[in-house]
Amino acid sequence: MVKLVLTEDETMLADSARGFLDKSAPVKAFRDLRDAGQTHDAKMWKEMAAMGWAGVLVPESAGGVDMGHAAAGILAQEMGKTLAVSPFLSTAVIAATALRHVSDARAEAALAKIASGDATYAL
């Protein structure tokens, strides 16, 4: 059965994300990045990584927080509200999910770089 109400932890995550994004990623920031031809704000991505967002789907053994897809969805929803420009979906969700299905040292190293915010992926 699908749950319709966020847990207390999920609500705290959403509130925290909303507070950060309201300050760090207003719609004006999106327009500025677009006009400058930039793909994302690298400084903001490092801040997101420091909060564990880049490692939301990365196993703890690789330096992630492994909070699951529900948490990733909450973060994506909050990012969408401010039009935050980040490599979150391509890197923290898609690449991390794909790399979790590979069991070798290269995948583990790549996951660690995702969690730290040192690598971004485009698929």
For each feature predicted by the language model, list its residue ranges.
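Intrinsic disorder at enzyme termini
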Residues: 1-9
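Short alpha-helical segments used as structural interaction elements across diverse proteins
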Residues: 7, 15, 28-31
